[in-house]
Curated annotation (Swiss-Prot):
This is Aspartyl/glutamyl-tRNA(Asn/Gln) amidotransferase subunit C. It comes from the Bacteria. Allows the formation of correctly charged Asn-tRNA(Asn) or Gln-tRNA(Gln) through the transamidation of misacylated Asp-tRNA(Asn) or Glu-tRNA(Gln) in organisms which lack either or both of asparaginyl-tRNA or glutaminyl-tRNA synthetases. The reaction takes place in the presence of glutamine and ATP through an activated phospho-Asp-tRNA(Asn) or phospho-Glu-tRNA(Gln). Belongs to the GatC family. InterPro entries: Asp/Glu-ADT_sf_sub_c, GatC. It comes from Geotalea daltonii (strain DSM 22248 / JCM 15807 / FRC-32) (Geobacter daltonii). GO terms for biological process: glutaminyl-tRNAGln biosynthesis via transamidation; regulation of translational fidelity; translation. The keyword ATP-binding applies. It catalyses: L-glutamyl-tRNA(Gln) + L-glutamine + ATP + H2O = L-glutaminyl-tRNA(Gln) + L-glutamate + ADP + phosphate + H(+); L-aspartyl-tRNA(Asn) + L-glutamine + ATP + H2O = L-asparaginyl-tRNA(Asn) + L-glutamate + ADP + phosphate + 2 H(+). The gene is gatC. Keywords: ATP-binding, Ligase, Nucleotide-binding, Protein biosynthesis. Heterotrimer of A, B and C subunits. Pfam families: GatC. The keyword Cell membrane does not apply. GO terms for molecular function: asparaginyl-tRNA synthase (glutamine-hydrolyzing) activity; ATP binding; glutaminyl-tRNA synthase (glutamine-hydrolyzing) activity.
Length: 95
């Protein structure tokens, strides 16, 4: 598949990018090379190959939950600029 400068400029417009003429020419060549590589990949015979989403067949590996001692409220709030009882006090951001 061949891409031309007009198509690159259209993609840039859709992406809200402002390209100079020189950049459009450069990206035309780069995108053309990328699409040529994709065309080459499309020529591969993938019959009998199982589609995969990940290279490693691994699912989430969670550790078992275990109860631990916490650092405590006083230690957690020790470096807080402002605090109110056992809470961080932060500036109001919503009116």
């Amino acid at each position: 598949m061949k891409i031309n400068k007009d198509e690159v400029e259209k993609v840039a417009l859709l992406a809200r990018l402002e390209l100079t003429g020189e950049e459009a020419e450069m990206f035309t060549g780069q995108m053309d090379a990328i699409l040529a590589y994709v065309d080459k990949l499309n020529e591969l015979n993938t019959d009998g190959i199982v589609p995969t989403a990940h290279a490693v067949p691994m699912e989430n590996a969670f550790r078992a939950d275990e109860v631990r001692d916490s650092i405590g409220i006083d230690n957690a709030l020790a470096n807080a600029p402002k605090r109110a009882e056992s809470f961080f006090r932060v500036p109001k951001v919503i009116e």
